């Protein structure tokens, strides 16, 4: 790793306070361009790369069937790196100064229906054993708190408070927030805690959610869990933890919650981020409007 890249890594970790997952994503993208530049142009120093070299990389990515979304993410990583070099006066102008992101299709995240969520939870209404108790709790936490997948995975045992029905999570950029729990979910937390103490081996004791082998969960484990349960009740293409978080927000809005409250629960820094969840509640709003307005023919 070059000195500038190491300094950039330190900057992301210490100043921007990005998670290890995010930092690695940035570095992987930059290393990918570095490898391309070395192979294509015999140039190991990407600090002084020009836009022509970067454009060649973009063409290569597209030719290798990388989606526009994937290419744009890589360009965002590279742009952040050159912005850092500008800030530290390593370069005078960014080679990506006039770069425009590739166009991407707008895809709506379709939430689960209330019935689909109820149907999944009814499958494990009376969970038996550690894994079923854990799985039901994870599904219910996503649906009743809007917790992010990373927040759930990194939830510490010491941040679970069943006496006042709250959990403390560490969100993006290490921002803490307190999430309220429904009493029924607090009861599940206690039940899971009892099952958890019965594990023969606990390696990652600091973390609340574990595998049956006592290890901390990972991203793919949680994704597979949600996808597996919801595949039995839903034909939607995407069945992920994020869709369940999206469902949490949509169902709150459909049932009268105000946008600012939902924003706080989701841990968004701006209202604009929360507004993407409002499209799903428009159908409910339209229904109320059509039923209530006197000009609509009955």
Q: For the regions a protein language model found, what residue spans apply to each?
A:
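Conserved catalytic core of the tyrosine transesterase superfamily
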Residues: 1-298
